[in-house]
Each structure stands twice: as C-alpha cells, then as structure tokens.
Amino acid sequence: KPEICFSFYNEKIFIDLINEIKNLQFEGYSLFIDEKGIIIIGCDEAGLYYGVVSLMQIVKGSLLNEKKNLIKKCKIIDYPDLKYRYYHESPGWGRKKEEKEKVVKWYKEYIKNFVAGQKFNMLCFNIDNQFTFSNPDLNTKAFITKDQYLEIAEFCKDHFIEFIPSLETGGHFNWVPKNKFPQFFEDGFTRQANVSHPHFYKFIFPVMQELIPEGCKYFNICHDEWWASPSADVTDKLNGIPRKEIFLKYVLDQYKWLREKGIRPMMYGDMLLKNHNGDDPGARKGLYEITKLLPNDIIIINWSSGVDPDSNKFFHNLGFEVICASNGFRPCVSDRNIVSGFGMLCYGFSFLMSGIVNDDFTLNYGYTSLLRTADYAWNIKNDTGFPVQEFERNKGKNVCAIGSVKPNPHRSSAFQIISLRKYVNSNLKDITGAELKISSAKNQFGFIPMEILKPKENEEKSLIVLNSEEKPIDIEINEPFSSIYFLHGCYIPKEKREEFFKQSSNFIWGVPIATYTFVYEDNTWERTEARFGLNILDISPPNLRSRYMSDIRYFWEGENDKEQPAFLYQYEWVNPNPNKKIKKIILQKTDTEAIAIIFAITARNVRWEEK
C-alpha cells in the first residue's frame, strides 16, 4: 500500500496538494511527480486507484521511448465529470466453440486494462444462456459456472467497478430454449416472453436471483425492443388486456422485487419513448404513456438519442437519472449538464477488437470507440464531442501503443536483431501483387532496431510467409531473452475474406491466424498467437481505421508500389521464463484463410540482477 514519507518531501507540499483536491468530486486525485519521487492523493479509495492508473499510463508512455526512459515532472489534478461511466457487455461467448477455458482469465485482464484501466466505474454484464443456471433445461449453451461468474464480479469490486447483473426477460427472451419452455413465449412473436403467464414469475425471479452477487447495488432489467416483428393480426391488447398495462405491471413487479433486496433497477428507454419504440402501430401502441407512472429512481439507460435527440431531456425532466449509452460512441453535447452517466453498448464486439466480424460495422464497437467513450465520460463537461475518427488521427497511434506495454521486470536496454536470412521464403509481390515502398535495411521501428531484408540481395526472398503450402518455420535462437518483437502483417485473398470473417463466431479473443511457439533448452515451451484484430491485421486493410489495435506497440505506415496505403504491425511477446535459453521459435499457420507474413524479429536482452 502507498505510504507517506516526509523524509522525501517538505510537509507543505502535501498540505498544498490536499487543499487543492479537498473540494473535488468523488473519485478525484492529485498526481505529483518530480525528481524526488511521486505523490498520489485520492479524494477516496477509487480516486487513489485512478491516480495510479494515470501514473501507469505515464510510465508506459515513457517505456515506449527506448532512448529516453524518463518520467517527466508533472502535476495533475483530475476528477470525473460524471457519476456513472458505463460499460455494457453482452458476451456472445456461448456461441463460441474455441478457447472457452481461457474466458475468465482473459476477461479479468480485459476488465483491468480496458474497463477499469480506462476509468469506467460500471460494468453491466448481460449474461444469459452462457451462465450455468441451477435449472439444467436452461443450460444448452452454458459454459460459465456460478463460481466463475462471482469471481468476475469480485474482480470488478477490487478494481472499483460496480458489477451490474443484466438479464433480458421481455423482448429478447430467446436465450430461453423455446422447446423446453414453450408456455413462456407469446404467440405471434419469435422471442417475446409471455410475462402474463400465471407461472412466469415463479420461473423468472429465481433465475434473476442466481445472478445477484453479494453487495449488488444495481440490476439492469433491460426491457428493450418488446413485441418486435409481430404477425399481422397482433393488436395492442393481449387476452383483452392493454399491452401497456401488462408492460407496466411487469416492470413495477420487478422494481418492487429488487427494491426489497436493496437493489436499484436500471432499464433501457426505447419502449418509453413515443419517437422510438414506444408507439408503433399494433402491439406497441401507446406504450410510452406508462413512462410517467414509473418510479423515477429507476436509472434509464438511453440508447435512443440518435433516434430521438430530445430523449435525454425527456427522461431528465421526469426526474430520472439518465445514462446515455449507445451502440458505439455517440456524444450528447447539448445534454452534458443533465445526464448522470455516459457509456457504450459493446455486445462482445470490442472484446474481439478491430474489424474482426467485418470491415466496417464492428468498428463502431471496436477499440478506439471504447477509448473515446471512456475519455468523453470522464471529461464530458469540456469535451466538444469530436468523432472517433478525429481521436484516431490525433491520438490513436500513441494511445494504442501505451495500451500494449506489458510488465517486463527483466528488460534490458540492449537488443539483438534475429536474422531471418536463412528462413525467408518469399517476397510480398508474389503474395499480394504489390511490394512495399520501405527502406530495406536495419531501421528503428518504434525505437526498436529491426531488419527488413532486400529481396534483390537474397534470391528475391525478404520475408517469411505462413500459408497452407508451407511447413512450420523453425528459427534457431539459443539465447535467453526477456521479450521478442515481431514486425508482421497478413494477407487475405479477396475471394476468401467473407469466409474468413465467419471464424469470428468460433473465437472469443480475436481470430488466431498463426502461432509463435518458443521452445526452451529443456524442451518446455510457451506460445503466443498472431490474432487478427488484436495484434495483426491486413497489410493493406479495406478499412484503414482497423489498424488501431489494442496489442500493437507500433505500426509502420506507408504505401506499396501501387500507391495503396500499407501498414506493418509490431507486436511484443514478454518471456515469462527469462532465465531459460530459448532454443528456437516455431512459426506456424492456423487453419484460417489468412496468410501471416513476418518481416522482422528482434529480441530484447535480459537485465540480470546484480549479485
């Protein structure tokens, strides 16, 4: 734990800093760095935590500059503008076929780096058929146990994040197997719950109870998109009862059930708005009229601001706290003084990262949208609401680099270029039809010395291509290193691109297109993967914005000889066993349509502790 050491500083410095922050809002902090040391003072425990988060961002930024690993003097006084900084995850992991055993480990890393690490303070976890319920008939796709779920919830608590259970119990009821529970589905709809069934409450409330961890403060009851895609004969009444009364009764009954447990409900606002989903002809007619009858201590998650620009004001004027959270980044500049929170609905796409499901749509949910949302939620009062694209142009490259820095306590300042001369097997023109306009020689890439070979000086071979026609490539090393840097990219034939994107339905954390296996002198090994959208991408991506990825230390940008933009991506693997000699690196393709291409490899030496 941090300690105050007055031998380093004059007591007046502490008193001045404390006086400067004592009137700050909750979660504020002061960070002071000079040649003597570092002081972090938090308004509360969360503020102290965010001060450390900012310090680590500064440290990581300094570590990227190999020529000048210095932390500059600074004084920061900072606090969030909003009470709620909301990150909503609807993990579609139950549909994934691979790597399920790594989900909890990866998700905890994700929370630390991308949720808490970007100073979100709410994580709404919209889990349904991925959860292992006590009722076995619900578990057709389950793979997260209750213990694992509670482990994630506790991890959030440790990182000052409110963990919010969320369950779709109305309009998106298709997580429940219809063949097992047909009585709880309303006729005329594919996914609508029949909440007026006499036994529905006996079914749904025990299910909700299983998702509530100890100390839970909020529960998102959702209620978006009720009665969607009705058959032609559906009216605004069900069994003679107005549907708006059915909807109101159900929300109020859930509200009462949660409040008796000391839990505050949250819900989406689209069904409560005349100009969004609350007044369509047929089943939804007049639904919005119930809004004024709801308790205004329900927190409204408003994803409707793009459809109804006045929706934040509408809810605010009725006394509701409003969290403006949309599909991707959608600023609410005119409402900055009335919303209580801001956030993003991610649906598992941002976990997959950049451009992984297709080349355009999922960028709305990708890495830079996540970063921009976090920045806006913290600084909304003075933020002009500039778009994600502007954020990418001005800050994307540096922010992505900072996020990629990994702990490496044995890092040395010395490097060794691993010569690929004996291993190269092709050139870029033979693979893609175009060659890069890049100086082939030893150069600095993100302050790391790397060597790209000249094809003409090496029998027209300058890189390692991993495709279905090639055997694994074994690169001899026989030295200990603290980390290894890869300068790589990939190529996906145009006619195979659509098929490649289908792989995203199998994997949780990017699609692995190649494996890099490190074999030690004792024949034990470690492995990392080149994961599309995470640390590797097309050399010439169809959507250039995809290049901003979460696990690339640096990207080279230029063009090929066809005047097309081109990029190479630098990825660092940190060796967990720096005391062992790495005998060899095995490079191997995975079973996808993508072709991984390695241009250069550099190793960082080990800094041995003095004895």
Q: Which role fits each region the language model picked out?
A:
Residues 1-46, 54, 58-77, 267-290, ...:
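Acidic, contiguous N-terminal accessory segments
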Residues 95-96, 130-134, 170-174, 227-230, ...:
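Flexible loop/turn segments at secondary-structure boundaries
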Residues 45, 92, 127-130, 166-170, ...:
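An acidic- and aromatic-residue-enriched active-site/binding cleft used to recognize and process polar
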Residues 392-611:
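N-terminal/edge-of-domain interface segments
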Residues 17, 311-315, 355-360, 497, ...:
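Short conserved micro-motifs at the rims of enzyme active sites and ligand-binding pockets
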Residues 22-266, 547:
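Feature activates predominantly on carbohydrate-active enzymes
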Residues 46-61, 354, 363-376, 487-491:
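Short, hydrophobic/amphipathic alpha-helical patches that form generic packing surfaces
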Residues 31, 66-73, 85, 108, ...:
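Substrate-binding groove of N-acetylhexosamine-processing glycoside hydrolases
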